[in-house]
Amino acid sequence: MAFCYRLDNFIISAFKPKHSNVPLSIHHSSSNFPSFKVQNFPFRVRYNSAIRATSSSSSTPTTIAEPNDIKINSIPTKPIEGQKTGTSGLRKKVKVFKQENYLANWIQALFNSLPPEDYKNGLLVLGGDGRYFNKEAAQIIIKIAAGNGVGKILVGKEGILSTPAVSAVIRKREANGGFIMSASHNPGGPEYDWGIKFNYSSGQPAPESITDKIYGNTLSISEIKIADIPDVDLSNVGVTKFGSFSVEVIDPVSDYLELLETVFDFQLIKSLISRPDFRFTFDAMHAVAGAYATPIFVDKLSASLDSISNGIPLEDFGHGHPDPNLTYAKDLVKIMYAENGPDFGAASDGDGDRNMILGTSFFVTPSDSVAVIAANAKEAIPYFKDSIKGLARSMPTSGALDRVAEKLNLPFFEVPTGWKFFGNLMDAGNLSICGEESFGTGSDHIREKDGIWAVLAWLSIIAHRNKDTKPGEKLVSVSDVVKEHWATYGRNFFSRYDYEECESEGANKMIEYLRELLSKSKPGDKYGSYVLQFADDFTYTDPVDGSVVSKQGVRFVFTDGSRIIYRLSGTGSAGATVRVYIEQFEPDVSKHDVDAQIALKPLIDLALSVSKLKDFTGREKPTVIT
């Protein structure tokens, strides 16, 4: 007879301590935290939050320890398929995570994968992007952490902490690590996506050595250790204690903002934003950045309140897709491309680690963005005034950054997609500024990409370029900065075609076909008017720890520097996303104003033809073009 035990007695929606001797201390909320309302969907907390354990055993849960009045229950469970943990943690549909023990198994498997000294009596951080299921998940994580001997957890108020903020808090508070509840730029809501990942003590995502162990332990897990404590009130800043275990609810903005103020010259940026001839707009996409936009851009930098759009974090992101690109941030694009549009526009994604930068009727590609930031950082950003240790990009990102590194004589690294590869270089003191073509940009101030950091970096550059511009004189614009950069370094025309939620079988067969093609390819082969320099499946050897990562993307590199790259993305929750990257370098300034899709058309046609993408996926056109 299958055993099913529901932990209804201590997973409840209200904060009701079981023991009269449990101390409770609630402090006043920090004034730095913005007033915002997280949208609530109708649900029964008891149903959604209950952890149910299924086992062939008919035994009841056993109390395995009761230190300082905390009862720890050992609940039988069994492995659940499909918990393979990737570069961005575990992402699935909400309904999958709501299956009995699905989340609890993964959290317990994580603790089973860590050395005890990495969490026993230690400090962990917990936060997320405010999406649907975060509130229930937070209570589950807190109780399992307590059950496994964690000493204290810091939780963002209302469970809110952006991914960059989690990294910042881990580093400032010297925590052992932290949980991030997010599916990043993927949609949220009962029918959409949820995700969880773990960051280590440096603030960077857990390495593959740990994520592989987590997956292995999900295949053999037999029990969940969970503390019999009530739900913790996450709506007020303060400390709640249960014996030797405590939960501190913190202002999600203050530590992160304090760090940013050491990186940038806020007075310089404020002098730009407060100019009557400069108009700024930021689209938070109803995601976590909305919790940071008002304290940073309005309260600190004097932007007008109406310059922040979609600034209230919602559990379903306002029925939107919180991915800052030309397709999903179309409202911002429309504003920026309108007649007499703002001078500067930006957007961030679900968990606040990605960004999109726009000028008046001008889109800055992420590849160009990181290159421009790197080229101007020493002059415009105080954090880099003494030195820039090195530059790095993900392999699919255009070579624009390479040219900056070469001109400035800086160390340069090309890594696989995944921020953890940058983190290793940063921890070794080899890297300062890095970026990915997937709208991720950042530096070694933390160990995650950082959307608001990128916005502030761009504002710093524009402010620096205009510090001597008098009222009435034409401001140096975003497009001016980029075009000047192209004139100095040349332009890397770049585009990415995304084919989302393809049938996995067809997508995998396409990659297999391309790998077979690699084995037959040789330098000098002609592909239309392009001559092959080399073709490979990208392999990376980490210069810090010597680890090797293979099969990171099929590359065709031609003698003129043009590239075609094919990858399957691991950040979605369903199906496969096929990504095709096309790049061509153009040194001729007279050709820099050509539309990228026109300049790249011959190479795009070649990319689709060589891969037989339509035959394998059935797709006539991409979901998103960047």
Curated annotation (Swiss-Prot):
Keyword set includes Cytoplasm: no
Entry's localization field: Plastid, Chloroplast
Gene Ontology CC, one term: cytosol
Keywords recorded for this protein, A-Z: Carbohydrate metabolism, Chloroplast, Glucose metabolism, Isomerase, Magnesium, Metal-binding, Phosphoprotein, Plastid, Transit peptide
GO molecular function: magnesium ion binding; phosphoglucomutase activity
Binding site for alpha-D-glucose 1,6-bisphosphate: R91, S184, D353, R354, T417, E436, S438, K449
Cofactor, free-text remark: Binds 1 Mg(2+) ion per subunit.
Keyword Magnesium in record: yes
Reported cofactor(s): Mg(2+)
UniProt note on regulation of activity: Inhibited by the Calvin cycle intermediates fructose-1,6-bisphosphate and ribulose-1,5-bisphosphate.
Enzyme type, top EC level: isomerase
Transit peptide: 1-66
A GO BP entry: glucose metabolic process
Entry EC number(s): 5.4.2.2
Catalytic center residues: S184 (phosphoserine intermediate)
Binding site for Mg(2+): S184, D349, D351, D353
Pfam family for this entry, one: PGM_PMM_III
Residue positions, PTM Phosphoserine: S184
Catalytic activity entry: alpha-D-glucose 1-phosphate = alpha-D-glucose 6-phosphate; O-phospho-L-seryl-[protein] + alpha-D-glucose 1-phosphate = alpha-D-glucose 1,6-bisphosphate + L-seryl-[protein]; alpha-D-glucose 1,6-bisphosphate + L-seryl-[protein] = O-phospho-L-seryl-[protein] + alpha-D-glucose 6-phosphate
Family: Belongs to the phosphohexose mutase family.
Subunit: Monomer.
Function: Catalyzes the reversible isomerization of alpha-D-glucose 1-phosphate to alpha-D-glucose 6-phosphate. The mechanism proceeds via the intermediate compound alpha-D-glucose 1,6-bisphosphate. This enzyme participates in both the breakdown and synthesis of glucose.
UniProt name for this protein: Phosphoglucomutase, chloroplastic
